[in-house]
From Swiss-Prot:
Keywords: Cell cycle, Cell division, Mitosis, Nucleus, Ubl conjugation pathway. The keyword Cell division applies. InterPro entries: APC10/Doc1 (IPR016901), APC_su10/DOC_dom (IPR004939), Galactose-bd-like_sf (IPR008979). It is found in: Nucleus. Gene3D superfamilies: Galactose-binding domain-like. GO terms for biological process: anaphase-promoting complex-dependent catabolic process; cell division; negative regulation of DNA endoreduplication; phloem or xylem histogenesis; protein ubiquitination; regulation of DNA endoreduplication. Component of the anaphase promoting complex/cyclosome (APC/C), a cell cycle-regulated E3 ubiquitin-protein ligase complex that controls progression through mitosis and the G1 phase of the cell cycle. The APC/C complex controls several key steps in the cell cycle by mediating the ubiquitination and subsequent degradation of target proteins such as cyclins. The APC/C complex is required for the female gametophyte development and is involved in several other aspects of development. Involved in the control of endoreduplication. SUPFAM superfamilies: Galactose-binding domain-like (SSF49785). Signal peptide: none annotated. This is Anaphase-promoting complex subunit 10. Pfam families: ANAPC10. Its main location: nucleus.
Length: 192
């Protein structure tokens, strides 16, 4: 899994963040396969800024809370990790403090799967979607919704600089010091 953000003793509270994003090789970024939408945005700070790989740009909501980010897939996918880049030092009252992550087949049946409280985060914040059961390492879903329920310092609108969504690789190869380059070699990579 990725390097987790520091989680306090109280379940669901996350403080800090990581300046460098480190993701395991057995995860892949799934956001490029999705249709992204937001509940509202200021002109010039739309949904594309969430995915442009630029930490200087940000999505800014424009309206009443909760602010919603919708991630819809054409087919059911396995998702394991949501990673946000937020910066309390730059954004102050625009920084999210309470976030709810919901999953489902569409808007009609979304269920909350994770609720977290961020405490002055700066950097990449990793939110694992795994359940309490150790066998539940991912969520199988058509849609993921990230709801910003409140901001720091009672701010109204929110800033999120980047979002990445990761799922397990379909056929992870056991950790080896090299990668096979041909399909023929790949077929002999494991024993039955």
């Amino acid at each position: 899994m990725a390097t987790e953000s520091s989680e306090s003793e109280e379940e669901g509270k996350i403080s800090g963040g990581n300046y460098k994003l480190i993701i395991d090789d057995d995860l892949r970024e799934m956001g490029k396969n999705a249709a992204w939408s937001v509940s509202s945005c200021k002109p010039g700070n739309g949904v594309t800024t969430l995915r442009d790989d630029n930490l200087e740009t940000y999505w800014q909501s424009d309206g009443l809370q909760p602010h919603l980010i919708n991630i819809q897939f054409q087919k059911k996918v396995k998702l394991q990790l949501v990673v946000l880049y937020v910066d309390f030092k730059l954004d102050e009252s625009y920084t999210p403090s309470k976030i709810s992550i919901r999953a489902g087949d569409g808007f009609h049946n979304l269920k909350e799967i994770k609720s977290v409280e961020l405490v002055k985060p700066t950097g990449w914040v990793c939110l694992s979607l795994s359940g309490t059961d150790p066998r539940e390492t991912f969520v199988n879903t058509f849609m993921l919704q990230i709801a910003i329920l409140s901001n720091h310092l009672n701010g109204r609108d929110t800033h999120i600089r980047q979002i990445k969504v990761y799922g397990p690789r379909p056929n992870p190869i056991p950790h080896q010091p090299f990668q096979f380059t041909s399909m023929e070699f790949l077929t002999y990579s494991t024993l039955r």
